[in-house]
Amino acid sequence: MRSSHVNKKKEDIRMNDRIAVKGLVISNDEIFRGYFTIKDGTIIEVGESSPGCEVIDMGDQYITPGFIDLHIHGIHTYLIDNGPDDLSAICRILPQYGVTGFLPTVAPRPKGEDALFLARLAEMKTAGTEILGFHLEGPFLRITGALGAGAISGADVERVHKLIEAAKPFSAIFSVSPDVEGIENLIPLMAANNTPVFMTHTAASVKETQKAIELGVRHATHFYDVFPCPSVLEPGVRPCGAVEAILADETVSVDFILDGVHVDPVAVKMALINKQNGTGKVCLVTDANVGAGLDPGEFTFGNMGDISFAYKGAPARSVKDNTLAGSGLTMDQALRNAVNWLDIDLPHALKLVSLHPAQVLGIDHHKGLLSAGYDADFVVLNNDLGVMQTWINGKCIYNKDKQINRK
C-alpha cells in the first residue's frame, strides 16, 4: 500500500470505496467537464453525468493521465546509482512532478557488480511512483557520452542473462547501440517475452539500424542526443545513418529531452510528422540527474564527479569538461515546453508523457488513459499546467494544497 501526503484519517480513501472525481477531464483527444469513478484503484466509469456517489471536485482544474518517464537517473539530491535508499527517495519525490510510473535508469558498472547492484534495487520495497521496470543504459553501447568507460562492452550473452535475472520481478529494458559488434546475438534475448529494447549512443549505419529493428529493437531513447552522423563517404552528399533509418520506420518510437538544449524543437516537430500514422510514436523523457527540480548549483554524479546547472531545468554539465550529463528537466516542465514549443494542443502534448510511453512498455491496456478499466493514475493540473495533485492506483500520493474538496 502506498503512503499518501493527505494525512487526516477522515480524508483517507479505502480501496474498496467507490468515489468520483470531477473536473476538466482530458483523455486521448478529448477535454470535457465530467466525472470518472474509481473503485479498488481502477477507473470503472467515465462520463458527464453525476455517478451518484461521493465526489471530489477539482473545479476548473485539468485532470490528466499520470506521466510516465522512460529515462531518469535522479532528482533533487538523489541518484539511482547510489543504491536502494536513493531509489526509494526518488519514488517519494516524483509524484510532485506528476510522475505516476517510471523506469529507474541505471548507469553501467563493472561486470559482476552490475547484476548484484541491480538485484539490490529490484528487491527494494518502495512507496510513491510505481517502478515499471529497470532501464539499463549500457554496457552494450558504442559511444560513452557521459556514462564513462563502463558503457562500452562487447557482446556477452551470459551477462545479459544475469542482468535479466537480477531485475526480477521487473523487466530489464536494455539500451544498446546497433553498431556494437555481436549485438545481433543479444537483441533477441533482450526482446524475449515482448520486452522493449531501446537504442541509443550510436553512429550506426542505415543497414546496422535496420538489422537491429528487424531483431526486435522498437524504441530510440534521447533521440538525436549522442546520435552522430556516420562518416561522410561521398563529398557533397549528406550521410544517412541511425537517425534517418529510425525516422523512416513507422514501427519505431522515439523519445526526446525537450529542454531546449539537447534537441531543437523543430527536430521534435519533424518526428511528430514522421510518426503520426504508424505504431511508433513520440515520447518525452527527462534523463534527469541529481539537481533536477532544485535551484542552480553543483551536485555529484557518480563517476562524472561534480556536475552543474546554469539555470533550473537546464541540462547538467560536467564541471570538469562541460560535457552534457543528463538534464535538470522534470516531466511537468517537459509537458509545458511541448505546449509552448511544438504547436500542439494540450491533449496531444499529454500523449507524449502518458499514453505513448505506456505504448512503448506495452502497458497501454491499463495505463496512459482515463478510461474504464484503466489504473486510476492521474494528475490534477492548474491553468498554468502546474501539478496540484498526483493520484496513483486511486490514492492521493501528492497534494500541494493538503486539502481535498469533497461533496
Functional labels for PLM-detected ranges:
Residues Q61-Y62, L70, I80-E130, A151-A166, ...:
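Alpha-helical scaffold segments that flank or form the walls of functional sites
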Residues S3, D12-I19, L24-T64, Q403:
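Histidine-rich, glycine-flanked metal-binding segment
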Residues G23, G41, D60, H71, ...:
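Divalent metal-coordination and catalytic microenvironments
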Residues R92-L103, I143-K168, K211-S253, D295-L324, ...:
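Active-site gating loops and adjacent loop-to-helix segments of metal-dependent hydrolytic enzymes
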Residues R238-F256, I273-T286, A292-Y374, F378-V380:
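His/Asp/Glu-enriched, well-ordered alpha-helical/loop segment
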Residues G23, Q359, L369-K407:
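C-terminal cap of metal-dependent C-N hydrolases
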Residues E165-D295:
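Active-site core of metal-dependent hydrolases
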Residues H73-H76, S88-F117, T129-I143, K168-D179, ...:
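Divalent metal-dependent hydrolysis catalytic cores, especially in the metallo-beta-lactamase
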